[in-house]
């Protein structure tokens, strides 16, 4: 079995969130804390479903993981809301992960709800996955803790018994080298060299708001190599930096493994472009790629890291500056080489220079040597016009802010020969064989070979014609465009203006333009794909300002897909040509995106192949013609008086005068020749200076155009965001007005329904009150009538009582009379009882009728209430379905409660009547059994029959109302009583 790796990674994958509120002006960030180390995700937009898509990881071994699991160490995730404007940080909530749930197998992510959620109305959740992964890679920077050294360094240091943090470079002044690692084990000699070869586009590092401290400032590159401060030769021209490539090297005693750990700890070399004590820009060269794990290249040949590195201004991050285009980015060519001492090397590094024209005067080709410096101390051993930073001050860094401002980069200095060529050219930097001493400065005699790298291109654009005008008025138009990638930001315009009318095609004069430039093919393709050519249509009017009508967008990448044709160049080399023709619409610049007219164009791209060998030229124009410095010859001696008299023209005096005049004329000619030569030299110098100033102005204009383009892009973006926000605000206001109207209508409708309900309830109450009043009045009348009958019966009873007493007194002694009187009395009582029974029967029938009417009225009210409820339900069916259901339920519940109460009242009344009937029936039985002396069985049977008849009548009466059926409780009770009476009757 393969043993498990001891090195693990605790990986927390934070994928996405949901149920978050939308806060457009805030950002969301999640911070994870474990074992004292804190990691965080990148800020994302504060939307309802934020996308984090971030993995956070901690290095750990199995033993420490086991201890953390025993101690139940949690992983706490905190979610914050950031305000970019005020940098305010609000806590949204937190999540606690249990480390014991982490497994080495891949697990599906889970949703975790935020605890102590700030947004109480939203149940915000985050999708998180917690896993363990085997740490197999040598160095994974994204998984390291912030201050953790590479893992290879840990392993090697543990083998050597040395802490990686204790590995430092110590200067050995006697031996002239730096010792890295223990001296008894690290004895291999190495040479580490840094070469600064070229620099381009340095003027981009100085914005228009910066001012340099001097009128003629001197610039230099500064870096620290093993504690040694190194600066190169200063130069004063940022646009055309002219300095010799210099190599600074140090000798090292170490071993490959210890040196790899040291380079991993000090993995970056910072190079600053300085002016005085200010850092204008810097770049970082990675050193950890020199010695790779398991590589033995250092034993065969030197290992190098070289290339053109982009310089970044120190305040780009603070000011949030926009990125500079690739063709305008400031770069510095640097080569870092590491070799064993005694091995020769040659490294290639690209030299990029600006395009230019050849000088008119004769030039002499010389190869520029590379100056080499050997560093043995903490300071640079050479002297330079620009003093290096003092030992007690730190070197300029990215954070050093400059306090000055610049209007333009114009320097008044002596003319120097400039290096001109086409394209980018690499140079070979060779290193001398012999190693210098402890403090020597040696000039290498090897040369810079410049192999070709870029292609020479010629791009031409022919704006042929415009046609199909859509405007109602004629246009006096010119076309204008610019494309800084071709080497010039100056606009190209057609001239003179041409008049275009409807239904006509007009050919444009002076519309052909060709551009010669050098670049890499992939850079050309990338630029053509990203940046289209924008052609502006302007209307020229003599009475007013020029008016921008529209813009045509020409996609230059179309020519890359066209067919290639082969042709021979001027020197017989093989070249390629691509041609593309098309018509594009010109879209209105303002208002709606309507087409104004169509533009027909033809573009051609010619590839002349790789650029030729470029060498550095040194002008010979400084070798002036030497001035003629002749002294006039002494006049001839006077002739002796003894000589013979001669002709006047033959005399010595005449000849001397003639020679003197001829000498004067010759001197005048020589002086005029010298003046002409000096004038020519001054004119050439003036022309060179003028060209130089023109290039500087063009570069500054290009830079300002790029800055203004960036500002214009920001302004356009801000305007677009503002328009979007205005549209969102307008739509939100419209939605608010609509919702307000709907709420107002809903409120009015609900108020009207409430008023209708109140009115109906009031009418129902009034009707019920009137009905109760009528019932009360009728009951009062019945009461008075019954009271009158009771009084009459009482009076009649008293009269009969008196008569009976008198008759009784008279018939006390007569049995027949007494019996007769008793019979009569009983007969009267019988009649009275029959009358009472009839009255009670009538009262019962009347009560049954009243009860039936009440039940019918109840059924009618119930039916009417149901009909009104159905009408309301139909009216509110679409909007208030749930309210209708609740209302119906409450209504039915109230109706059932009312019916139950009425049934309870009816049941109580029935019980009362039943009790009354039973009492009457009992009285009748007692009267019949006691006074008449009739048989007990016949009376009981008649009572049961009457009771049975009464029960059957009550049941039938209730069934006829239509309110009750056989399943109701009262009907079931009546049926039960009827069965009991029938049973008793059959038994008797």
From Swiss-Prot:
Residues 354-425, 624-644 are annotated as: Disordered. It is found in: Cytoplasm, Cytoskeleton, Microtubule organizing center, Centrosome. Residues 384-394 have a biased composition (Pro residues). Residues 1-112, 435-569 form the C2 domain. Disulfide bonds: none annotated. Plays a role in the microtubule-dependent coupling of the nucleus and the centrosome. Involved in the processes that regulate centrosome-mediated interkinetic nuclear migration (INM) of neural progenitors and for proper positioning of neurons during brain development. Also implicated in the migration and selfrenewal of neural progenitors. Required for centriole duplication and maturation during mitosis and subsequent ciliogenesis. Required for the recruitment of CEP295 to the proximal end of new-born centrioles at the centriolar microtubule wall during early S phase in a PLK4-dependent manner. Belongs to the CEP120 family. This is Centrosomal protein of 120 kDa.
């Amino acid at each position: 079995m393969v043993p498990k790796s001891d090195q693990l990674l605790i990986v927390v994958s934070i994928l996405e969130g949901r149920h978050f509120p939308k806060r457009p002006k805030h950002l969301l960030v999640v911070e994870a804390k474990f074992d004292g180390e804190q990691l965080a995700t990148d800020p994302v937009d504060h939307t309802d479903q934020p996308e984090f898509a971030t993995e956070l990881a901690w290095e750990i071994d199995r033993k420490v993981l086991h201890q953390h699991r025993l101690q139940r160490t949690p992983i706490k995730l905190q979610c914050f809301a950031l305000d970019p404007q005020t940098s305010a940080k609000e806590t949204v909530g937190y999540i606690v992960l249990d480390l014991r749930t982490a497994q080495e197998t891949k697990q599906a992510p889970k949703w975790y709800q935020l605890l102590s959620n700030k947004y109480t109305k939203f149940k915000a959740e985050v999708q998180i996955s917690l896993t363990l992964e085997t740490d197999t890679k040598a160095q994974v920077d994204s998984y390291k803790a912030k201050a953790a050294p590479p893992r290879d360094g840990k392993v090697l240091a543990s083998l050597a018994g040395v802490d990686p943090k204790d590995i430092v470079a110590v200067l050995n002044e006697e031996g002239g080298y730096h010792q890295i690692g223990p001296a008894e084990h690290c004895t291999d000699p190495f040479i580490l060299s840094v070469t600064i070869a070229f620099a381009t586009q340095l003027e981009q590092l100085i914005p228009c708001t910066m001012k340099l401290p001097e009128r003629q400032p001197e610039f230099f590159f500064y870096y620290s190599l093993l504690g040694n401060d190194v600066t190169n030769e200063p130069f004063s021209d940022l646009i055309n930096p002219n300095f010799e490539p210099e190599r600074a090297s140090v000798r090292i005693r170490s071993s490959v493994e210890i040196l790899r750990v040291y380079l991993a700890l000090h993995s970056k070399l910072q190079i600053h472009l300085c002016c005085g004590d200010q850092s204008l820009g810097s770049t970082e060269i990675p050193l950890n790629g020199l010695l790779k794990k398991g590589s033995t290249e250092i034993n065969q040949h030197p290992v190098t890291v070289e290339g053109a590195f982009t310089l970044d201004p120190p305040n780009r991050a603070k000011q949030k500056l926009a990125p500079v285009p690739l063709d305008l980015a400031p770069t510095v060519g640097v080569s870092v080489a590491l070799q064993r001492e005694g091995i020769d090397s040659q490294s290639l590094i690209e030299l990029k220079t600006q395009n230019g024209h050849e000088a008119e005067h004769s030039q002499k080709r010389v190869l520029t040597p590379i100056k080499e410096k050997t560093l043995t101390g903490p300071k640079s051993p050479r002297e330079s016009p620009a003093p290096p930073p003092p030992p007690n001050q730190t070197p300029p860094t990215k954070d050093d802010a400059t306090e000055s401002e610049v209007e333009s980069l114009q320097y008044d200095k002596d003319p120097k020969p400039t290096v001109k060529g086409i394209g980018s050219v690499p140079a070979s930097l060779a290193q001398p064989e012999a190693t210098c001493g402890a403090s020597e400065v040696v000039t290498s005699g090897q040369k810079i070979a410049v192999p070709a790298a870029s292609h020479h291109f010629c791009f031409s654009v022919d704006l042929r014609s415009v046609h199909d005008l859509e405007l109602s008025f004629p246009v006096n138009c010119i076309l204008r465009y610019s494309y800084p990638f071709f080497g010039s930001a100056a606009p190209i315009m057609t001239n003179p203006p041409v008049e275009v009318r409807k239904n006509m095609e007009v050919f444009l004069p002076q519309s052909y333009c060709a551009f010669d430039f050098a670049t890499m093919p992939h850079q050309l393709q990338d630029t053509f794909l990203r940046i289209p050519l924008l052609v502006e249509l302007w209307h020229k009017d003599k009475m007013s300002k020029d008016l921008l009508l529209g813009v045509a967008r020409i996609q230059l990448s179309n020519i890359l897909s066209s067919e290639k044709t082969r042709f021979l160049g001027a020197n017989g080399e093989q070249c390629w040509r691509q041609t593309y023709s098309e018509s594009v619409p010109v879209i209105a610049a303002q208002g709606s995106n309507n087409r104004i007219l169509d533009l027909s164009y033809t573009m051609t791209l010619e590839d002349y192949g790789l650029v030729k060998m470029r060498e550095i030229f040194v002008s010979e124009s400084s070798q002036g013609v030497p001035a003629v410095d002749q002294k006039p010859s002494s006049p001839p001696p006077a002739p002796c008086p003894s000589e013979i008299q001669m002709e006047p023209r033959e005399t010595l005096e005449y000849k001397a005068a003639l020679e003197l005049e001829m000498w004067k004329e010759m001197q005048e000619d020589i002086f005029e020749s010298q003046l002409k030569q000096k004038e020519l030299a001054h004119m050439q110098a003036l022309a060179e200076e003028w060209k130089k100033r023109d290039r500087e102005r063009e570069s500054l204009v290009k830079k300002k155009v790029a800055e203004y383009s960036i500002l214009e892009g920001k302004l356009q973006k801000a305007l677009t965001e503002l328009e979007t926000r205005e549209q969102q605000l307008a739509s939100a206001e419209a939605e608010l007005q609509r919702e307000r109207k709907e709420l107002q209508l809903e409120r009015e409708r609900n108020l009207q329904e409430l008023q209708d309900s109140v009115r109906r309830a009031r009418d129902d109450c009034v009707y019920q009150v009137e009905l109760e009043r009528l019932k009360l009045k009728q009951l009062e009348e019945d009461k008075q009538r019954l009271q009158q009958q009771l009084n009459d019966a009482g009076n009649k009873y008293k009269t009969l009582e008196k008569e009976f007493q008198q008759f009784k007194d008279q018939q006390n002694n007569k049995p027949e009379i007494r019996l007769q009187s008793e019979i009569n009395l009983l007969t009267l009582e019988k009649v009275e009882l029959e009358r009472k029974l009839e009255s009670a029967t009538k009262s019962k029938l009347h009560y049954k009728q009243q009860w039936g009417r009440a039940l019918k009225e109840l059924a009618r009210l119930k039916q009417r209430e149901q009909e009104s409820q159905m009408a309301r339900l139909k009216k509110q069916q679409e909007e208030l379905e749930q309210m209708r259901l609740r209302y119906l339920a409450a209504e039915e519940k109230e109706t059932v409660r009312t019916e139950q109460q009425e049934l309870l009242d009816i049941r109580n009344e029935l019980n009362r009547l039943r009790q009354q009937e039973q009492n009457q029936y009992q009285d009748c039985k007692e009267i019949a059994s006691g006074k008449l002396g009739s048989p007990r069985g016949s009376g009981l049977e008649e009572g049961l029959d009457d009771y049975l008849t009464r029960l059957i009548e009550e049941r039938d009466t209730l069934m006829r109302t239509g309110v009750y059926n056989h399943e109701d409780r009262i009907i079931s009770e009546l049926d039960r009583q009827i069965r009991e009476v029938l049973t008793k009757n059959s038994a008797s």
